[in-house]
Amino acid sequence: MMKSIALALCLTHHSPMVLSIVDYGDSQEKTIDSLWKKPHGSDLTWSGFSRVGVTEAYFAVPVDHFLTNPPSLRLSQTIYCRRGSSYVETEKVEEEDRDDFLKQVWFLTDNLVFFFVDIEEYIVIEQLGDTVYLWDASSCYTSKLVTIDDENGPVTSINWTQDGLDLAVGLDNSEVQVWDCVSNRHVRTLRGGHESRVGSLAWNNHILTTGGMDGKIVNNDVRIRSSIIGTYVGHTEEVCGLKWSESGKKLASGGNDNVVHIWDRSLASSNPTRQWLHRFEEHTAAVRALAWCPFQASLLATGGGVGDGKINFWNTHTGACLNSVETGSQVCSLLWSKSERELLSAHGFTQNQLTLWKYPSMVKMAELNGHTSRVLFMAQSPDGCTVASAAGDETLRLWNVFGEPPKTTKKAASKKYTEPFAHVNHIR
């Protein structure tokens, strides 16, 4: 499978910069500290790497230089761009608006970390659109995937299919674009599902589920022309989190109305009444942190925002709350270990830390510090060992959190991904 890197570019009238790129590659032998030594850029800093450490590389690279002379990225390398003086001059937006808690803009595939920085404030001030680029690590070839114009943008959510071949791009104008990232081809645009921005996306094979600012959740079958096959109605404010269970039978949603819903895939309807299996109202702030447990299929962890700060654990069969843990700060994201009974939580004010918990005792095992603003996004590497975190401080950090991956058989290791809807023709 082609190795790809997706870039997020912040385009200004002054000096466009690459914001972030990470290449995990396909080698299981390289370590995170085997990074290239001579960066194409400046402002380079390094720090140690350990179970509670981080390895980082910061760069400022002009886009025109990068597109014509892309650096040879190696395993787990981060490119980062600090805002220059031209950006600082535009700080007319309130600080709390700079890292929108509700937007889902951070994703990981087999060999790819994609970090899309929300630049809505610069689009408003500079009247600019969003551009998404793909970078092929095997050939060092960079290509523009799509530029969203001011009228339709900015990009408010992005999510990869399970095989990492197709990308869904949610927009501020209520539309969702689907892109084939192997051929850099626009497959289709989904319309009519929402009335405002699409802030959450989740794939379930050929079903793309979208969550909007209008509170609606829509299931789209991307194989058919009339894509909308069902809706879930229950949230009264923006849907800011969506996660399908591993089986694909249950969907968890979190909203700005402080509510968590559990939905059954088979109950989605174009004429909804009371559809949810369970409705949880225990949180007292917005819920965007959702994580299905990999070792107990019915277990869901949820985290509340500012004013709540709790991690709640739910039995989604019975609807019972199994435990509630006060963390002391906003819970922005949650990740389960794939090999251990551990949970990682990402937080906001005051410490902006990542916290590692032992489940089910919820004994605090470690705190990972370094971010200076709330940690909005986390994603795991394919082996589950490395976690990447992105924060409002505009840094992407890589952590060796969960230890060695579980042993896999040759049969399992040789398993190849197939495109979820490869057997049907794409519809533009």
Swiss-Prot record:
Report the GO terms under cellular component.
Answer: nucleus
Keywords tagged on the record: Cell cycle, Cell division, Mitosis, Nucleus, Repeat, Ubl conjugation pathway, WD repeat
Question: Which compartments is it annotated to reside in?
Answer: Nucleus
Question: What InterPro entries does the annotation carry?
Answer: Cdc20/Fizzy, WD40/YVTN_repeat-like_dom_sf, WD40_CDC20-Fz, WD40_repeat_CS, WD40_repeat_dom_sf, WD40_rpt
Repeat region (WD), residues: 106-145, 150-189, 193-230, 234-273, 282-324, 326-367, 370-409
What pathway or pathways are given for this protein in its record? Protein modification; protein ubiquitination
SUPFAM superfamilies in the record: WD40 repeat-like (SSF50978)
What binding partners and quaternary form does the record give?
The APC/C is composed of at least 11 subunits that stay tightly associated throughout the cell cycle.
- What name appears for this protein in its UniProt entry? Cell division cycle 20.6, cofactor of APC complex
Gene that encodes it:
CDC20-6
